[in-house]
């Protein structure tokens, strides 16, 4: 059996729509094995997803088909599922990356992360979640001719934590995409380009006092925020309680606050605020995962 662990991810990072992503230290773990009996065998997977349309199986089959690898049956087990589903934290990317890595391992082939990225983008459609899930850390990504993904890892200074403010409801990527405008004003493009460049420099040199301005966005957040109850109140309170910045994680509905890693009051203050307002959201204090997806050995 092959065990694979994949981190959560937060994409967009304010102005970096479909281009910036970061890996975070909550994980899903998966186990894969070949079976002598023909068929698909699932464990830890909801019944409605126990079929050939399962995204994990689709990723595995993509690799097997590419290399003409023949198999009778396959076992897919979710050992641990700590990444919340449809919350803007890369749960689907985790499944895709795990399936691809698991497939290479089952074939006994070397894990080529560049190839895994290309295959993952063919499935996902964009690289900003799958790329940090594969490589870890903070990455800047683009698509060349809508086919080939290019990426560069961004060095960052320590000193910050990421606080995921996770609503108790799901928001599908399809619904979140549907509210976006078909065209964006030129001035809004300039607004985001400048802040995306500033954001990368803030992470690189540790000038986190500029993050509040550097994570602002005019391309997607104001449209998607209308789908999220309590968005404005939670966003404003996070800044009031001392966060460097707050932004929508991925397509939402999770909001991500960045705080000083020495700040011991933010989570306490926010927890009390949520309780007082009866806002039933989860709060997770996270750090950057620097390693990305990996095969677990000897566990």
Where on the chain are the PLM-derived regions?
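Short beta-strand-to-loop capping motifs
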Residues: 34, 143, 167, 257-261
């Amino acid at each position: 059996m092959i065990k694979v662990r994949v981190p959560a991810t937060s994409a967009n990072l304010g102005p970096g729509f479909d281009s910036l992503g970061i890996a975070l230290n909550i994980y899903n773990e998966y186990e894969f094995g070949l079976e002598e009996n023909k068929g698909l065998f699932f464990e830890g997977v909801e019944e409605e997803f126990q079929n050939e349309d399962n995204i994990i199986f689709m990723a595995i089959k993509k690799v097997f088909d590419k290399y003409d690898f023949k198999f009778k049956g396959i076992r897919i087990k979710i050992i641990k599922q700590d990444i919340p589903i449809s919350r803007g934290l890369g749960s689907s990317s985790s499944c895709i990356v795990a399936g691809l890595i698991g497939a290479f391992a089952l074939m006994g082939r070397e894990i080529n992360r560049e190839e895994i990225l290309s295959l993952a983008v063919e499935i996902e459609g964009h690289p900003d979640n799958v790329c940090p899930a594969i490589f870890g850390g903070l990455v800047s990504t683009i698509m060349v001719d809508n086919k080939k993904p290019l990426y560069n890892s961004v060095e960052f200074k320590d000193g910050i934590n990421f606080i995921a403010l996770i609503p108790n409801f799901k928001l599908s990527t399809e619904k979140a995409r549907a509210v976006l405008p078909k065209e964006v004003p030129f001035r809004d493009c300039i607004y985001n380009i400048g802040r995306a460049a500033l954001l990368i420099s803030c992470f690189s040199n540790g000038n986190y006092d500029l993050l509040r301005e550097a994570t602002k966005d005019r391309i997607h957040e104001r449209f998607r925020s209308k789908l999220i109850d309590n968005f404005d109140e939670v966003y404003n309170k996070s800044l009031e309680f001392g966060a460097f910045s707050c932004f929508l994680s991925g397509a939402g509905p999770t909001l991500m606050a960045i705080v000083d890693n020495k700040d011991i009051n933010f989570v306490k203050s926010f927890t009390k605020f949520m309780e007082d307002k009866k806002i039933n959201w989860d709060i997770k204090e996270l750090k950057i995962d620097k390693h990305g997806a990996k095969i677990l050995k000897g566990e």
